Regions:
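Alpha-helical segment proximal to the catalytic Tyr-Lys
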Residues: 123, 167-171, 228
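Short C-terminal tail/terminal secondary-structure segment
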Residues: 87, 92, 143, 198, ...
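Residue(s) in the substrate-gating loop at a strand-loop-helix junction
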Residues: 138
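C-terminal substrate-recognition "lid" of short-chain dehydrogenase/reductases
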Residues: 115, 130, 209-237, 242
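Active-site helix of classical SDR
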Residues: 118, 154, 162
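Short, small/polar-rich loop/turn modules that mediate ligand/substrate recognition or access, typified
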Residues: 75, 170, 175, 230-232, ...
Length: 244
């Protein structure tokens, strides 16, 4: 069976991706700083195979260990989903009030972490002549969302990184794409996010709140053989908000 690594896979969107991939026949490596036991148990209870791996994606040592663990346990690394992000701890405010420490932390996780995870899996994917990297960005990149410029800028960087890697890794048989969701309410969101969601829903033709499961079809498409000739792309999943 093919193997997929999902960073930030213990809860939220990452956990949804893990369950969907397991249901589609993937062996799943749940990578997170949080406890991965519940996610692994849920996958195994449904008949899938999974392991957990405590990982700080901003650490090269951790990401290299993650890749080695995945390959050692399941034999191949076929898909990497870079989902882990620094977001829920951010307090919205004017751009000039963002602390340097918070700016740096956001980039350490969202940008450096994504790059390090790609670096870690690359030797395995190159050796096997195939692989799929799926990076998670955000529609805030296109709207210039006010209040957290460091997060928006970090996610915009992900799209640039995706295009660079798609061009460089294509000859090795590796595709690299980005998926950009809109605001997706989850237990970690703040009251201000709930208010924002009301405005987001009003902007889109599909008049409802986006849920994590809305991402599954796109993720499985990019992880599967049907997308073998698709690379360097950013797929926006937001209920058509940008068509108005």
């Amino acid at each position: 069976m093919p193997t997929a690594i999902v960073t930030g896979g213990a809860r939220g969107l990452g956990r949804v991706y893990c369950l969907a991939l397991a249901g589609a026949g993937f062996d799943v490596v749940v990578a997170d700083l949080l406890d991965t036991g519940d996610a692994v148990d849920e996958i195994e209870a449904a008949g899938g195979r999974a392991i957990g791996c405590r990982t700080d994606i901003s650490s090269a040592t951790d990401t290299e260990a993650l890749a080695a663990t995945a390959a050692g346990e399941f034999g191949t690394i076929d898909v990497l989903i870079n989902n882990a992000a620094f977001y829920s701890q951010i307090v919205r405010g004017p751009f000039h009030e963002v602390s340097q420490a918070e700016w740096d932390k956001t980039f350490e996780v969202n940008v450096r972490g994504t790059w390090l995870a790609c670096c870690a899996v690359y030797p395995y994917m190159k050796e096997q002549g195939s692989g799929k990297i799926i990076n998670i960005a955000s529609t805030t990149c296109f709207k210039g969302t006010v209040g957290f410029p460091h997060y928006v800028t970090s996610k915009t960087a992900i799209i640039g990184l995706t295009r660079c890697l798609a061009a460089e890794l294509g000859p090795d048989g590796i595709t690299v794409n980005t998926v950009s969701p809109d605001l997706i309410p989850n237990p970690s969101l703040r009251p201000s996010d709930e208010v924002s969601d009301q405005f987001v829903v009003a902007e889109r033709p599909l008049k409802r709140t986006q849920v994590p499961e809305d991402m599954v079809g796109t993720i499985l498409y990019l992880a599967g053989r049907g997308s073998d000739f698709v690379t360097g792309q950013n797929i926006v999943v937001n209920g058509g908000a940008f068509c108005q």
